[in-house]
Design a protein with these regions (language model features):
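Catalytic cores of the polymerase beta-like nucleotidyltransferase superfamily
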Residues: 1-363
Length: 363
């Protein structure tokens, strides 16, 4: 989704309406039509509808239906029980999987992440009302057209991230949704609606209920978006205050502007953007933060080396740079150059390192 902003520009030259037509892939149409021929409803739903409306090719297609899982399985030759206890069956067509999920009403979220039970429903509206954001609560089929009960089209037109229903309820159900709001904001270049933002601030401590592995996934998606500087929202909402204090400081303290600009000016490589976010501490502190975040070992090692050999930690003389190149190797040194160039651009400094061409002959 990193190129959404550029891909959606032509689509949104004029405001979208509920009459919007979606050209469903052949396999998706086949699944929906097959379920309908057996007397049930079926719709494409969620992110695939959102992305298509915005002119972006979806990574996958999800389908929602009032057919029960066992009924769905009986209609297709090859299926996989991927989450049948929650109503999800994966239909395999032409080596591609399509998740088909029965309309459901979620029970209580006792752990702040997952429903303790689900109840299957016969009404599409029951399924849409449990979803996180309005832009993800739209459904579509060729017979009915677009179903948009919560103003998803309006929020796409106005570039707004807004919860379905009461934000506090949505975030109490699943605390990860607070990070997802910020991640979608960064990926789409959208603003978080006031009540949704205030609910994140109020419930920020609940993020401790989310595993660090899931936190890591959302942070990486935010950093690899076209707006990595939106990471400041992880600080201003206090989401990272208790779970990732170094990153919280990076996004809120006096040096946050330089850090976020460095992140923005860095090329779209995860180690570079992580280095920018962790440049307010030592390489050892960065390593501790990344291990707590459950980052992979290769990325941790790369970030630590970039910080160790960056312009802040080595003399900007040719002998010192040659020595650094020898110690860290060509691949890491090229990342050091890229990081330092972004750092200088962010700091509006003119230094030796600000002109990589001056020492490209050393690499």
């Amino acid at each position: 989704m990193s190129d959404i902003l550029s891909e959606m520009s032509d689509t949104q030259a004029s405001p979208l309406t509920k009459d919007f037509k979606i050209d469903l892939p052949e396999d998706v149409s086949f699944i929906i039509n097959t379920i309908e021929k057996n007397g049930h409803q079926a719709y494409a739903v969620g992110g695939c509808v959102r992305d298509t409306i915005m002119g972006v090719t979806p990574n996958d297609w999800d389908i929602t239906t009032n057919a029960l899982p066992e009924e769905v399985k009986s209609y297709f030759t090859k299926t996989i029980d991927t989450g049948i206890q929650h109503g999800t069956v994966t239909v395999i067509l032409h080596s591609t999987g399509y998740e088909v999920t029965t309309y459901r009403i979620d029970g209580d979220y006792l752990d702040g992440r997952h429903p303790s039970s689900v109840e299957f429903s016969d009404r599409l509206t029951d399924d849409l009302c449990r979803r996180d954001f309005t832009i993800n609560a739209m459904a579509y089929n060729e017979r009915t057209g677009l179903v948009d009960e919560y103003g998803g089209i309006d929020d796409i037109n106005n570039k707004v991230i807004r919860c379905v229903g009461r934000p506090e309820e949505r975030f109490t159900e699943d605390a990860l949704r607070m990070m997802r709001a910020i991640r979608f904001s960064a990926q789409l270049g959208f603003t978080i609606e006031d009540n949704t933002y205030k609910a994140i601030e109020k419930l920020s401590a609940n993020i401790q209920k989310v595993s660090m592995e899931r936190v890591c996934v959302e942070l990486k998606k935010t950093l690899m978006s076209d707006n990595p500087d939106f990471c400041r929202l992880y600080g201003t909402t206090n989401l990272f205050k208790d779970i990732l204090p170094q990153l919280h400081d990076s996004f809120t303290k006096r040096q946050s502007k330089r850090i976020l600009l460095t992140c923005k000016y860095s090329e779209k490589e995860l180690p570079l953007r992580l280095t920018a976010c962790l440049s307010n501490g030592t390489p050892a502190q960065a390593e501790d933060t990344l291990r707590h975040l459950r980052m992979d070992n290769k990325t941790i090692e790369t970030v630590v080396k970039i910080l160790t050999f960056s312009k802040d930690n080595i003399e900007e003389t040719e002998p010192a740079i040659r020595e650094a190149l020898h110690k860290c190797g060509r691949d890491i040194f090229e990342l050091v150059i890229k990081y330092d160039f972004a750092l200088v651009k962010a700091s509006e400094e003119v230094t030796f390192i600000s002109n990589p061409a001056r020492y490209n002959h050393l690499v």
